[in-house]
Design a protein with these regions (language model features):
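Cysteine-nucleophile active-site neighborhood
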Residues: 1-29
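Amide-donor transfer/coupling interface in amidating biosynthetic enzymes
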Residues: 11, 25-146
């Protein structure tokens, strides 16, 4: 939503980005109050088939992180608003809870094959500790801003 409001477009991705995948931080993160303490690469939970595009020419947008499939994983608009594509707000039951939604399970299986939900859930649990650590860092950094 933020991407469209500031002049970009939300479009269907060339292929859905689903799974526990890498997020690569750019040099801009070093100057950012929320993300400066993050490592250069983190694992994240992705489950989307739309993405923000066309923010390149908006001078007040700073790209902070990308992935191989999605350029705008994290971007900042001016100094007050952030767009985050991946899911940082996860818990142990997120994948299994979302997998109960027939449309979500169908999208998952059409992308990753039958039985993908169990593997995705296991991958999430394996990476849960580090993903929750980054969520806590983000929250703590956010509290310092307000």
């Amino acid at each position: 939503m933020l991407g469209e409001v500031i002049g970009g477009k939300v479009v269907k991705s060339s292929k859905p980005e689903i799974g526990i995948l890498d997020i690569d931080f750019l040099e801009n993160k070093k100057k950012d109050q929320l993300f400066s303490t993050f490592p250069d690469k983190i694992k994240s939970l992705q489950w989307h088939s739309y993405e923000v595009q066309d923010l390149e020419n908006i001078k007040s947008v700073t790209l902070i992180a990308s992935s191989p499939e999605t350029k705008y994983q994290i971007f900042k608009f001016q100094e007050h608003a952030y767009g985050i594509q991946f899911h940082i707000e996860i818990k142990d039951t997120t994948v299994s809870d979302w997998g109960c939604v027939p449309e979500y399970k169908s999208a998952l299986e059409s992308q990753l094959g039958k039985g993908a939900l169990a593997k995705f859930d296991n991958d999430a649990k394996i990476n849960m500790s580090s993903m929750n650590k980054y969520s806590t860092i983000l929250y703590d950094n956010f509290k310092k801003l307000v």
